[in-house]
């Protein structure tokens, strides 16, 4: 069963992602801040990390860089969750260490398969 770490300061966004992913066989771990998310990633070593780009304590790109700099979490795919169009953000997302980008609000019907496509070994 794949494990997804959801890092988003919006309770509603975390809940929706959690419900949709768990219904499709994922385990989920959640954080509301970048620092909490980085700590949980090192503790749980999930298969994929879904991260909002605008967090209250740090920029999502800074959190992604922290994860990529640590050998425990460097290989975990980090996927940006944002309302920002990918065309405007694609290059800097890659340079920050993101594996890809998924639009918010999430599309319930396709979200689990999109997340699964990023899972390590998946």
What are these regions, as identified by a protein language model?
Residues 8, 55:
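Conserved acidic carboxylate
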Residues 12, 33-36, 59-65:
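Acidic catalytic/metal-coordinating carboxylates
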Residues 15-23:
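Charged docking surfaces used in two-component/phosphorelay signaling
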Residues 18, 62, 84-102, 109, ...:
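Alpha4 helix (beta4-alpha4-beta5 surface) of REC/receiver domains from two-component response regulators
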Residues 25-32, 40:
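Short hydrophobic/Thr-rich beta-strand motif most characteristic of the beta2 strand and flanking loop
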Residues 39, 61-74:
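Short amphipathic alpha-helix used as the core "switch/output" element in two-component signaling
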Residues 52, 82:
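Active-site residues of response regulator receiver
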Residues 56, 74, 86:
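The feature encodes the CheY-like receiver
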């Amino acid at each position: 069963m794949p494990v997804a770490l959801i890092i988003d300061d919006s309770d509603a966004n975390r809940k929706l992602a959690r419900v949709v992913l768990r219904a499709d066989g994922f385990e989920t771990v959640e954080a509301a801040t970048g620092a909490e998310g980085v700590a949980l990633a090192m503790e749980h070593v999930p298969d994929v990390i879904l991260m909002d780009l605008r967090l209250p304590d740090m920029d999502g790109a800074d959190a992604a860089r922290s994860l990529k700099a640590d050998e425990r979490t460097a290989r975990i795919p980090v996927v940006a969750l944002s309302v920002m169009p990918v065309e405007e953000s694609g290059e800097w997302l890659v340079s920050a260490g993101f594996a890809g980008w998924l639009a918010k609000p999430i599309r319930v019907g396709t979200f689990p398969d999109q997340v699964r496509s990023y899972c390590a070994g998946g």
